[in-house]
């Protein structure tokens, strides 16, 4: 969408934008953005040509994604062919969720999932997640180590207390948020 061709010709554009809550000690670090080229994202071909998984952050089967974060997370972008099935292993103490972008899934042989749905898995219970695509499906599977801190959100800010929210708005109004630096990985 930043290319001259896209600007001139238009077309469909789809993205998933994620905001990751930071530990309290890191909330006031300077903002940043990671521009990651698709060529730097490992692609895992799933068994029996059933689909593929792109490891954007974290690790899957020995492949490490290029995105970095302040606390341990996994961000996997997956696709499964119709009637394909795969079991994903996730860290036992992570919070895990699946966002279905397209298609239809059956999770753990019991939960039917429709497009534009989010599934939140029970922590410490579901470390083996079986996914069956009843249609060609695209999804994002995310896991993260719980911060175990209070959360207070309002508008674009997520802090730990209401007072910190007020301070964040005040800092923003006063221009204290600085410039956004782009961390780009280029060959």
Identify what each model region corresponds to.
Residues 1-187:
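Jelly-roll (double-stranded beta-helix
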């Amino acid at each position: 969408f930043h290319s001259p061709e896209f600007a001139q010709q238009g077309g469909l554009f789809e993205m998933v934008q994620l905001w990751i809550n930071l530990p309290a000690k890191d909330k006031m670090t300077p903002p940043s953005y990671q521009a990651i080229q698709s060529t730097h994202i490992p692609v895992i071909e799933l068994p029996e040509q059933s689909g593929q998984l792109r490891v954007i952050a974290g690790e899957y089967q020995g492949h490490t994604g290029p995105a970095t974060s302040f606390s341990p997370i996994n961000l996997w972008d997956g696709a499964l062919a119709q009637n394909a099935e795969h079991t994903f292993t996730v860290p036992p103490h992570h919070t895990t969720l699946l966002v279905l972008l397209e298609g239809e899934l059956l999770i753990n042989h019991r939960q039917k999932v429709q497009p534009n749905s989010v599934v939140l898995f029970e922590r410490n219970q579901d470390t083996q997640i079986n996914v069956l695509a009843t249609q060609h499906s695209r999804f994002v599977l995310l896991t993260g180590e719980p911060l175990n801190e209070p959360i207070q959100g309002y508008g674009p800010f997520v802090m730990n207390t209401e007072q910190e929210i007020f301070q964040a708005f005040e800092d923003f109004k006063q221009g204290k948020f600085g410039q956004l630096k782009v961390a780009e990985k280029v060959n």
